[in-house]
Structures are given as structure tokens and as C-alpha cells.
Amino acid sequence: MLSGFYQESEGKVSFTRDQASRFAKLIADDYNPLHDIDAKRFCVPGDLLFSMVLNKYGVSEKMHFTFAGMVDEKVSLTFPEAESDIALTQDDKVYLSVNREGETSTCEELTQSLIKNYVEFSGKTFPHVIIPLMGEQEVMINPARPMVMYESMSIEFSNLDVKQPVLEFVTPEFELSGKRGKITLPFVFKDGDKVIGKGEKNMLVSGIREYCQKTVDELIAYYNQRKIDLKPA
């Protein structure tokens, strides 16, 4: 699933703008302008980094990811040997730290299923979840600079004896503080009807402004048009 979206040389992993942008749009259905090839403040999708970690280290019963820096096309990340605490770095600067606990599964079917389900869920939260959620408190993102940034995410399984867990979204939360806010997007993992795990994605929002329905309608229309215009072949 990830071949073609990164390159590795001398033990370091990097991403071109085209690779990162194609992953965002093709795999995650994520049209955040930060992932556009020509973005001035370009960054590699956090979901691509998450996927790379699972692809290399497997799935642990408990995993917590903290995104500490924006990775662009100039960054070459070092992936260390597998430990309970992992840091993806360049020149001692940490871009992503991962804490792992419990047993670890290297089952490829589980890993690929989890990557696919999580990335699809994660990429589709804007605008269809985030905008209505913020609207409940009469605020919205700034359409001129829609700054929605990945802060952290976590997953937890009661056991790893499963190959294709199904991810189900549960009630999101939004904490407003002035012109900034934090969005929490929780979910559960199921095997049939049985809940076997849980997790959450945490995002930071800045430049928050007063809610305007007309502007929201225009923003959603603009976003939907971007999906048509920018969908990779």
C-alpha cells in the first residue's frame, strides 16, 4: 500500500511533495491545502508517518503518537531500531515520537487493514465532521487560512488476535479557547459485534472566527471542487 509514497536511502526515509500529496488525496481522501504540491507551508500528512511506523514496527496493544514537527520534502527521517519508545528524527530534531506498550503483532493483514481503515477515517473528518462540530459553539475555521494541525493520536487493543478490525467513529469533542481549539475524534475497533479496542485523534485549530453559514457553504463548495480538480489520476 505504501510503495511509491516514499523513498529510502542510506537508512533514511524521505518524501517528495508529489508522493505526500498523492498519498493524502488518493489514500486518505484528504484535501488539506497543507498537502498540496505547491503549498507555501507544505507538510507530509501525519497519516503517512503513522502508516510508515505501523509498516515498519507492526501493531502494538497500546500505541501513542505525538507529532512534534512538520515534515517537508527536505527532511530525511531516521527510523531507529524497535524499542518501546521510538522517535523519528533528523539531526536530533524529533518529528514524531511513538510510545508502545504490550504485545506486538507483525501480521501484515492486520497492519494493512488498520492502516487502510484509520487513514480513510482520518482523512474524511474535514469538512464533514469538523465544521458541524465547531458550528455547535458558533465558531468556524478561517477559510483564508484553514489551519488544522495533527497533534497526537492513540490506539489500544484488548488483544491482537484479529486480522481485519473494523473502525467505528464515536461522538467527537471540541474544546474552544479564544481563537484556538482542540478537536478530539474518538473511535472504537470491532471484531464482528465485539469491541476489541479504541483510539482517538487529536487536532489543534487556530485562527478561529465567528460562525457564518454563507461562508461555511462557500468553504464546503470550494473543498468539494478541490476534490474534483485535484484528484490524482
What annotation goes with each model-predicted range?
Residues 44-87:
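Extended, compositionally biased flexible segments
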Residues 1-24, 69-71, 80-166, 175-233:
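HotDog/MaoC-like acyl-thioester-processing domains
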Residues 169-171:
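Long, helix-rich, hydrophobic modules that act as membrane-proximal anchors or helical bundle/coiled-coil regulators
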Residues 2-62:
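N-terminal ordered "arm"
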Residues 36, 76, 138-140:
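Glycine-centered secondary-structure boundary/capping sites
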